[in-house]
A protein has these predicted regions:
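N-terminal glycine-rich FAD/FM-binding segment characteristic of electron-transfer flavoproteins
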Residues: 1-316
Length: 316
């Protein structure tokens, strides 16, 4: 039976929700053991993150890799360490997020192993399904015998695992030469009190129909009323209404909330590819022929400038 190493994503204080979904994928492998590797520096909240990982169902051990060079999650610095620690494992998995997509291919290269991206279904220990062509086709990938399996997991395809009695936390170290050509400069992030877009259970997104960046206050007001994250279509981002970290879709962020509200979004194929795993989709658009209504569970043909304020007022 396989041994799986899951790479935890965190911000130094809190474990990213995607890690719990990667564990669900790892569990589908029927593994003998599933260990979670947490990289960071001592005194930066690393112990808290390790505790959060240890409490997730299915975790056998949490491996704490603390060193000063891990103060920032630089893929070039983390990859050699992970490749060394992964020596005794059959599978190395991480989330298919910006972090995971940057890190895991490097790990695969160092291990001379195939890299499988966007795993959405486990068919067997070495066989997986992944989406292609904006999710319109599913590709079956088989990893040859004799090599490790290194992959990123499409977190939108899995539900987070539950909790368990805490697993043991063990300190580990890597015998790896670290590169010096990459250095951390600074982290800039916009201040926001809303949930993370990719892990939120509710998302409200606006499209080009919103008309302007100023009008996006309507999207933010509705999102805040619902306790939801705020997103946008590519058209709204390209028009400069909002920053590109809000983009939902094939070329943006793939989301799988329980509730997705699309306001003024026509429903381009690349946007629909990013919300295909959403639970309930609600669409508000004045164009009754908009493609978004073909996938919506609830559709409201109305002027968003009248409908959204009315919804905000009606919500408790």
């Amino acid at each position: 039976m396989a041994k799986v190493l899951v790479i935890a994503e965190h911000d130094g204080a809190k474990l990213n929700a995607g890690t719990a979904k990667v564990l669900a994928c790892a569990g589908a492998l029927g593994a003998q053991a599933i260990d979670v590797l947490v990289c960071g520096t001592d005194g930066s909240g690393l112990d808290t993150v390790c505790g959060q990982a240890a409490a997730l169902a299915g975790v056998s051990r949490v491996l704490k890799n603390a060193r000063a060079e891990n103060a920032a999650p630089l893929a070039a610095v983390l990859a050699p360490q992970i490749a060394d620690i992964a020596a005794g494992y059959d599978h190395v998995l991480g989330p298919s997020t910006t972090f995971g997509k940057d890190l895991l291919p490097r790990v695969a290269g160092l291990l001379c192993a195939p890299a499988v991206s966007d795993i959405m279904t486990v068919l067997g220990p070495r066989q997986f399904e992944r989406p292609i062509y904006a999710g319109n086709a599913i590709l079956t990938v088989t990893v040859p015998d004799g090599s490790k399996v290194v992959g990123t997991v499409r977190v939108a395809s899995y539900k987070a695992v539950g909790e368990q009695a805490p697993a043991p936390v063990e300190a580990v170290s890597a015998n790896a030469a670290l590169p010096t050509h990459t250095r951390f400069v600074e982290l800039r992030a916009g201040a926001k009190d809303r949930p993370d877009l990719q892990s939120a259970s509710k998302v409200v997104s606006g499209g080009r129909g919103v008309g302007s960046g100023e009008n996006f206050r309507l999207i933010f007001e509705l999102a805040d009323k619902l306790g939801a994250a705020a997103g946008a279509s590519r058209a709204a981002v390209d028009a400069g209404f909002v920053p590109n970290d809000m983009q939902v879709g094939q070329t943006g962020k793939v989301v799988a909330p329980e509730l997705y509200v699309a306001v003024g979004i026509s429903g381009a194929i690349q946007h629909l590819a990013g919300i295909k795993d959403a639970g309930t989709i609600v669409a508000v658009n004045k164009d009754a022929d908009a493609p978004i209504f073909e996938v919506a569970d609830i559709g409201l043909v109305a002027d968003l400038f009248e409908a959204v304020p009315a919804l905000v007022k009606a919500l408790p």
